[in-house]
A protein has these predicted regions:
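A structural boundary/capping signal
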Residues: 15-206
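Sec-dependent N-terminal signal peptides
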Residues: 3-13
Length: 206
């Protein structure tokens, strides 16, 4: 009876939209970690709740909800630098580096109906610390300063208000871009290898 209940719950909660989990996957996740299974189910419930929100409220809700998952660096998790985890991998493990937060926010917002052409995985330089970081940019309108979703901040601000960040590259399915002074996106490459590899894994529902 308990197993039947789990199957019914997972069938109801997980749609065909990515990220989706099969009943077999849910069963495997539960065997490894009940916490991970609960996290996966909670994610689906939260996204269903967020569908009734306005776009502005969805941005805030997604940023706050996913930021609450704890960070841990790639070299600790996989012994591989710059490992781009899929949302399913991220949800199963429960933590990740900055790019993993960006990626799950990117696909979650697409799942909620955001235009993927307005969302960009963004490599930035931290002006005061001198290191590299990754955030998600959302261009609400053309030639406007993009809104920044950052795993280090619960507040969403436009890029021109983030004086601590300098945008380097904007990446999505349309290519790799730089931002001009008048806020136009200028294409510098047709594709990014890491993003292509990520998209391939997502297409295979990994």
């Amino acid at each position: 009876m308990k197993n039947l209940f789990i199957l019914l719950i997972s069938t109801i909660l997980f749609s065909s939209e990515y990220p989706s989990f099969t009943n077999i996957e849910i069963s495997h996740i539960q065997k490894k970690s009940k916490i991970a299974k609960n996290r996966v189910i909670d994610y689906s419930k939260k996204i269903k709740l967020f569908t009734s929100y306005s776009k502005e409220k969805q941005l805030r809700a997604v940023n706050v909800y996913l930021n609450r998952l704890l960070p841990q660096y790639d070299d600790i998790i996989t012994n591989k630098e710059n490992n781009w985890a899929t949302p399913k991998e991220f949800l199963t493990v429960g933590y990740g580096d900055c790019e993993d937060y960006v990626i799950i926010k990117y696909y979650t917002l697409i799942k909620l109906g955001f235009d993927d052409k307005k969302l960009f995985i963004t490599v930035v330089k931290e002006k005061f610390k001198g290191g590299s970081h990754m955030v998600l940019s959302y261009f609400k309108t053309q030639c406007s300063s993009p809104l920044i979703l950052d795993n280090l901040s619960f507040k969403i601000l436009p890029l021109d208000k983030r004086h601590d960040l300098q945008a380097e590259y904007f990446i999505n399915s349309t290519g790799v871009f730089k931002l001009s002074k008048n806020l136009n996106l200028l294409k510098v490459a047709d594709r990014a290898k890491e993003f292509e590899e990520l998209e391939e894994k997502v297409k295979n529902n990994l």
